[in-house]
Amino acid sequence: MIQTNSLFDKINFNGGNLSSDGGSILLSQFLKKINLKKLLDSIPFVDLRHLPVYSNTNILFQQIIKCLLGYNDQSDQKILINDPLLSLKSLICSQATVSRFYDRVSLNTTNEFKKIITQLAYDFVNTNIDDPILDADSTMVTTCGNQEASAYIHHYQENGYHPLIINEYHSKLLLSSLLRTGSAYSSNGIIEELEQIFTQLNNTGNIRFRGDSAFYRRDLFKYLENNQVTYYIRVKNFKKNIRESVMDMVINQADWNDFDYTEPYYGEYTIQINKTKKRRIVYKAFHLEKGGMLQLVPMVYCIITNDFEKSPKEAMDFYEARGNSENFTKELKDDFNGGILSHKEFVKNEMDFLISSLAYNLYHVFQQTILEEKDQTIRMNTYRLKYQKIAVKVIQHARQVTLSFSSAYKNKTQFTQYWNKVLQI
């Protein structure tokens, strides 16, 4: 006989109307206040059903809630069905119903859905951000098996899709979330996406754009200049740029051996486009060691910009701050499941990617509107641990519902404050 020394005599899972997601009421109430379901009603589907029990809007809303709460597996649909809190105010469908929902998705569906996602972001940015900073980034979503439009991406040395992401830096919001085929080059579609953004954003010459070397394109420079956008884009390691930078250091009598990675040399020079047009190359340079020996040629890191006001160091520091936006992309992929697309058909995967994108934007609008101080910087997974995962008992009596939270919850004061802010919207 196995001898045990347990602290408890028995355990069971028959506690009654208990939920571990008591804090989900914050986001659920917020979505109700902004009338999200009404916005989703306008999305078209290829729907030939007669008198369906679950509308497409209802099913889509459930998937958004699932994504926000961090339930990303197909089997997690059962959690929504069985949870006494999550199933309280709406009829939850089965996983089979969700699977059939994706069969009704078309290209028209995803196009209209994307418009809703971006319009929410535009409205927030236009209202709350005076000087928008747009950060463009291409990323990868790994695929498995024979998924439609997947291809080998040499940069990542894996098969997958190649999404294009454009964030607004201050708000973290996605202004563009484009799932592209695996064969798409890093900057494919950037001008088309920016055209849509610039028709919606308030542009008084205050918009700035940042991108890595994948966006080093002359047609993009010209397009941004024509739209009065200040840009900062990484220059590819052309030998000509390295040579010009070294010559500039020689002219200024700067010895790159006196500068290292932590304290580099900052310099600049201009390139002539035509008789009236110039662009500015800002660079930093420092010596390299290999095998204890100094290299003859310094490491040179360049950006191109049409900003002639910032000092070289200020311009370079401003560009390098875009590294934070790469963390926003990681949050989309890791915390909102945007990095896992499991359908065989591309349009279904695009729908899933857009659901993740909308959930990401909804959280960050909620974060900037409701949360305070340090909570305005936490990622979604941290928020879930801090404010969502709270034990609660659901008590229904005389047509009233009472939620009785755990008395041991340590953030009760802050939670109550946030709850009252949501109710006042």
Locations of regions flagged by a protein language model:
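Short amphipathic alpha-helical "interface-anchor" segments enriched in bulky aromatics
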Residues: 30, 77, 140, 312-351, ...
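Dynamic "connector" segments at or just before major functional cores
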Residues: 1-200, 224, 367, 390-425
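Acidic/histidine-rich, metal-coordinating catalytic segments
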Residues: 137, 206-215
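Basic, amphipathic alpha-helical segments enriched in Lys/Arg and hydrophobic/aromatic residues
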Residues: 339-400
